[in-house]
From Swiss-Prot:
EC number of the protein: 5.6.1.7
Enzyme class: isomerase
GO cellular component: cytoplasm
Protein name: Chaperonin GroEL 5
Task of the protein: Together with its co-chaperonin GroES, plays an essential role in assisting protein folding. The GroEL-GroES system forms a nano-cage that allows encapsulation of the non-native substrate proteins and provides a physical environment optimized to promote and accelerate protein folding.
PANTHER family the UniProt entry points to: 60 KDA HEAT SHOCK PROTEIN, MITOCHONDRIAL
Pfam families, per database record: Cpn60_TCP1 (PF00118)
Induction of its expression: By heat shock.
Keyword annotations of the record: ATP-binding, Chaperone, Cytoplasm, Isomerase, Nucleotide-binding, Plasmid, Stress response
The family this protein is said to belong to: Belongs to the chaperonin (HSP60) family.
One biological process term in Gene Ontology: protein refolding
Location of the protein in the cell: Cytoplasm
Gene this protein is translated from: groEL5
């Protein structure tokens, strides 16, 4: 076991504080509408330019082990806020740095660290309650666009696309962000349920220009096993032919004789038909077939349920207004399933999302929910260079999370003002002793840090801005760093999601409280590298 180095009390806290400052100072330059960029060197490819706090934090690794511990603890604040709210990482970092600094001063002057932490926790709970009481529910599309614009660092185009996407697919819908092949940013919305399986034979194609199969008002047969001959299906096929409607077959696979028979029937014009493979694998495939059945009002033909292919009748087939099949995906539009059944299924999937501990499973369940509840929107981010596209994509991701958070818990005045106003909740707060009171006051001072930093990044004097804001008591009265104006921030469109502000404060206080109560630090001693031995003389005669 390698030898360890141990640091205590002031020495430990000083080193840790140095690490905290290095990381926070690199991250906080990105805060606010006039925040600057950070350039990150990459071992391969072009350097990365970003204004995303968590991306900067994740890149920082310090040589001194003790300083690095402080930096990594602070990085945890940014990562946690990013995981929970998806934005507000820079605000959380700035708050954590301010609380740690104030806390370290208090501990150095002889205060009890545990009581300080209790005071910090009391203050944070009171401020969070005040924030929740003042949060305003988001209703209008324009407000969603404003939240998106602010999180994308003032890019109105991104805000507009996000608002449009959320309007089209709903709050439950999946919105994905991809890199575009062109210089333009564009939005594509897939309405209905889409899954990534295409036609099994190009002979099924009905629209030669677009190379796709289009079936209007088709019947849909959902079968979980392979189909290798059609003998068992003949009764239902005859019934479909008599109805004059097209047929879509979704099965594990359609092969050999079965596929050949379907193709021949299609080419002769006897039956408008297309076949696709079922999406997913294993248990997920069963669940997705059940989703399709509920969406289309059909029944899954499954031996588990005791349903044989021979006994399938027309009323067991699903229906949809339209089905469009391309080489690699199938879209079912306007399924005929009952609204109550679809709502029941979405409630069941939501419950599974709550229970699951796996991020992968959660993502897949959310995709299934979106396909049932709304649709899928894809924002393709374009730019002139790869570096620009990556930087813009970071901002779109932030903005997407922020708009979701805003819909979830409402909005607050932006620019750090909500925290500044919520401080009044600390006025009547009762504490058990003086050290806890110092912990509360410490949060009162630290909470000004985001406003001060936004002002500093915009080239203004933080203390003057804070002083002017304190003169007015209205909750939404603040300073717009973009235009250098004072007024109602809601009216100016300077708003933050309540969830982002709340999460930033709670995560910052949580990690800062741990740092303040740290009394000893242990790290591996750096190994002393032995000087390389000189090569032996080669016995040369002169």
């Amino acid at each position: 076991m390698a030898a360890k180095e141990v640091k205590f009390q002031t020495d430990a806290r000083e080193r840790m504080l140095r690490g905290v400052d290095v990381l926070a100072n690199a991250v906080k330059v990105t805060l606010g509408p006039k925040g600057r960029n950070v350039v990150i060197d990459k071992s391969f490819g072009a350097p990365r330019i970003t204004k995303d706090g968590v991306s900067v934090a994740k890149e920082i690794e310090l040589e001194d082990k003790f300083e690095n511990m402080g930096a990594q603890m602070l990085r945890e604040v940014a990562s946690r806020t990013n995981d929970l709210a998806g934005d507000g990482t820079t605000t959380a970092t700035v708050l954590a740095q301010a609380i740690v600094r104030e806390g370290a001063k208090a501990v150095a002057s002889g205060m009890n660290p545990m009581d300080l932490k209790r005071g910090i926790d009391l203050a944070v709970d009171a401020v969070v309650k005040e924030l929740k009481n003042n949060a305003r529910k988001i209703s209008k599309n324009s407000e969603i666009a404003q939240v998106g614009t602010i999180s994308a660092n003032g890019d109105t185009e991104i805000g507009r696309y996000l608002a449009e996407a959320m309007e089209k697919v709903g709050n439950e819908g999946v919105i994905t962000v991809e890199e575009a092949k062109t210089a333009e940013t564009e939005l594509e919305v897939v309405e209905g349920m889409q899954f990534d399986r295409g036609y099994l034979s190009p002979y099924f194609i009905t629209n030669q220009d677009k190379m796709r199969v289009e079936l209007e008002d088709p019947y849909i047969l959902i079968h979980e096993k392979k189909l290798s001959n059609l003998q068992a299906m003949l009764p239902v096929l005859e019934a479909v032919v008599q109805s004059g409607k097209p047929l879509l077959i979704i099965a594990e696979d359609v092969e050999g004789e079965a596929l050949a028979t379907l193709v021949v029937n299609k080419l002769r014009g006897g039956l408008k038909v297309a076949a696709v493979k079922a999406p997913g694998f294993g248990d997920r495939r069963k669940a997705m077939l059940e989703d399709i059945a509920i969406l289309t009002g059909g029944t899954v033909v499954s031996e588990d349920l005791g349903i044989k292919l021979e006994s399938v009748t027309l009323d067991m087939l699903g229906r949809a207004k339209k089905v469009s099949i391309e080489k690699e995906n199938t879209t079912i539009i306007d399924g005929a399933g009952s609204k109550a059944d679809i709502e029941g299924r979405t409630a069941q999937i939501r419950a599974q999302i709550e229970e699951t501990t796996s991020d992968y499973d959660r993502e897949k369940l959310q995709e299934r929910l979106a396909k049932l509840a709304g649709g899928v929107a894809v924002i393709r981010v374009g730019g002139s260079t790869e570096v620009e596209v990556k930087e813009k994509k970071d901002r779109v991701d932030d903005a997407l999370h922020a708009t979701r958070a805003a819909v979830e818990e409402g909005i607050l005045p932006g620019g750090g003002v909500a925290l500044l106003r919520a401080v009044k909740a600390l006025d009547g707060l009762k504490t058990a002793n003086n050290d806890q009171r110092v912990g509360v006051d410490l949060v009162r001072r630290a909470i000004e840090a985001p406003v001060r930093q936004i002002a500093e990044n915009a080239g203004a004097e933080g203390s003057i801005i804070v002083g002017k804001l304190r003169e007015k008591t209205e909750f939404s009265y603040g300073w717009n760093a973009q235009t250098n104006e004072y007024g109602d921030l809601y009216a100016m469109g300077v708003i933050d999601p309540a969830k982002v502000v709340r999460t930033a404060l709670q995560d910052a206080a949580s990690v800062a409280g741990l740092l303040v109560t740290t009394e000893a630090m242990i790290a591996e001693k750096p190994k002393k590298e032995a000087a390389p031995a000189l090569p032996a003389g080669g016995g040369m005669d002169f």
